[in-house]
UniProtKB/Swiss-Prot annotation:
Domain of life according to the entry: Eukaryota
Cofactor note (record): Binds 1 FAD per subunit.
Organism encoding this protein: Arabidopsis thaliana (Mouse-ear cress)
Sequence similarity: Belongs to the NADH dehydrogenase family.
Protein name as catalogued: Internal alternative NAD(P)H-ubiquinone oxidoreductase A2, mitochondrial
Length: 508
């Protein structure tokens, strides 16, 4: 079945977990050990193909309900801002933590645009889950599963999951169940395409590290292809036309980084094409609508100086080499980045749970899903129910982070009150409900310029500023917000080397 050499020690608690994880001599035990214990130096895993085809594979794996004497289990779906902040704050003396996510790291999204052009390296914005919550890799009852959740059975207190694989030389997609005492849905949202034809096939989003990698490779490929002998002037201009759809902070920051890259690096290292490369930002309404008019006008002025062209219009169709606006204008492009906001994911839409007016999972002031026991939702996938009388909070990192922190403290209080087990917290006083206070907004626009607005809203009184000082505040603030000292060091070193030597334009 399996063989592990040089395994240091398996504690009695670990042995009990393994015994319960194993059903009928299945290969799930070997799968668990291979993914769970970093001290295993050699592992041989039984192929799932040996299981008879007429047998339901889901019976071969799963985490059963916790027993008396074991810690209650908190299952977290997602590894974004909300889920990771919750896992960081949860008391692992009270709970076992199981995280289910299609990625094993958290992405520091405010700096993701900088990785697209080589200002920062990709590892600078990715923090492993095992560093955020060490119990995931150390405690016998805590796990991380690289998987997607496909179904919620709230009556049975179970989630149904399916492993994420490459479909080639690893395991075939493997279905399993996890019983929970407390479930936290923090699965985030997906990019909104508004049903526009061709967006999914031709545009690149900017929400994950692999998106930034794809943008960087595509950008550098187009730069090199445009210098090919014999290429027409028209085709060269198309290849070097970078189009950004969406004038929110992500779209504006990426446009600023891209224009900065063109002015400082492309013109020095790709002198033959420096006059043909340009950036166009398309927005249906005003850019940076969350900022006041003064800050928006400053951003437009600075981006225009950097060569960014603004087009007001609605995209109606996206083809492989051009997009078409509502007035019939055709815009050829070589790189298309789509940044038009987010909406509920297919998983969230599939759940038979109450929804808020925007289609997100409906919650009350304590992050609970009122219609089911022991289920909470935080981050971009959740919003207040209309019955609470509260408006839906914006899909921002600072909202998700503070919801995660609040819920971690709430679950810790519930656990200390002996309410950690399933269906045991009905009579526990939950305390003060969650209250969100906006701390302000920031956006960089390139060329050592940024916008900083420290007011609760764009119409309130307070501090707002622009220019170099704002850029310095923006960098300082985000450097301190990077989760680990390791990544802070990476970010600081990357900024320094970029300033001294320029951006890395290697296409690897």
């Amino acid at each position: 079945m399996f063989m592990i050499k040089n395994l240091t020690r398996i504690s009695p608690n670990t042995s009990s977990i393994i015994t319960r994880f194993r059903n009928s001599g299945s290969s799930s035990l070997s799968y668990t050990l291979a993914s769970r214990f970093c001290t295993a130096q050699e592992t041989q895993i039984q192929s799932p193909a040996k299981i008879p085809n007429d047998v339901d594979r889901s019976q071969y794996s799963g985490l059963p309900p916790t027993r008396e004497g074991e810690k209650p289990r908190v299952v977290v779906l997602g590894s974004g801002w909300a889920g990771c902040r919750l896992m960081k704050g949860i008391d692992t003396n009270l709970y076992d933590v199981v995280c289910v996510s299609p990625r094993n790291h958290m992405v520091f999204t405010p700096l993701l645009a900088s990785t697209c052009v080589g200002t920062l390296e990709f590892r600078s914005v990715a923090e492993p889950i095992s560093r955020i919550q060490p119990a995931i890799s150390r405690e016998p009852g805590s796990f991380f599963f690289l998987a997607n959740c496909s179904r919620l059975d709230a009556d049975a207190h179970e989630v149904h999951c399916e492993t994420l694989t490459d479909g080639l030389n690893t395991l075939k997609p493997w279905k399993f169940k996890i019983a929970y005492d407390k479930l936290v849905i923090a699965s985030g949202a997906e990019a909104s395409t508004f049903g526009i034809h061709g967006v999914m096939e031709n545009a690149i989003f900017l929400r994950e590290v692999h998106h930034a990698q794809e943008i960087r490779r595509k950008l550098l490929l187009n730069l090199m292809l445009s210098d090919t002998p014999g290429i027409s002037k028209e085709e060269k201009r198309r290849l070097l036309h970078c189009v950004v759809v969406g004038g929110g902070p992500t779209g504006v920051e990426f446009s600023g980084e891209l224009s900065d890259f063109i002015m400082k690096d492309v013109r020095q290292r790709y002198a033959h094409v420096k006059d043909d490369i340009h950036v166009t930002l398309i927005e249906a309404r005003d850019i940076l609508s969350s900022f006041d008019d003064r800050l928006r006008r400053y951003a437009i002025k600075q981006l225009n100086k950097s060569g960014v062209r603004f087009v007001r219009g609605i995209v109606k169709d996206v083809q492989s080499q051009k997009l078409i606006l509502d007035d019939g204008t055709e815009v050829p492009y070589g790189l298309l980045v789509w940044s038009t906001g987010v909406g509920p994911s297919p998983f969230v839409r599939s759940l038979g749970l109450p929804k808020d007016p925007t289609g997100r999972i409906g919650i009350d002031e304590w992050m609970r899903v009122p219609s089911v026991q022991d289920v909470f939702a935080i981050g971009d996938c959740s919003g207040y129910l209309e019955t609470t009388g509260k408006p839906t909070l914006p899909a921002l990192a600072q909202v998700a982070e503070r919801e995660g922190k609040y819920l971690a403290n709430l679950l810790n209080a519930i656990g200390k009150g002996n309410g950690g087990r399933a269906n045991s917290a009905k009579e526990i006083e939950l305390g003060v409900p969650f209250v969100y206070k906006h701390l302000g907004s920031m956006a960089t626009i390139g060329r050592y310029k940024a916008l900083v607005d420290l007011r609760e809203s764009k119409d309130a009184k307070g501090i707002s500023m622009t220019g170099f000082v704002s850029w310095f505040i923006w960098r300082s603030a985000y450097l301190t917000r990077v989760i680990s000292w390791r990544n802070r060091f990476y970010v600081a070193i990357n900024w320094f080397t970029t300033f001294v030597f320029g951006r890395d334009i290697s296409r690897i």
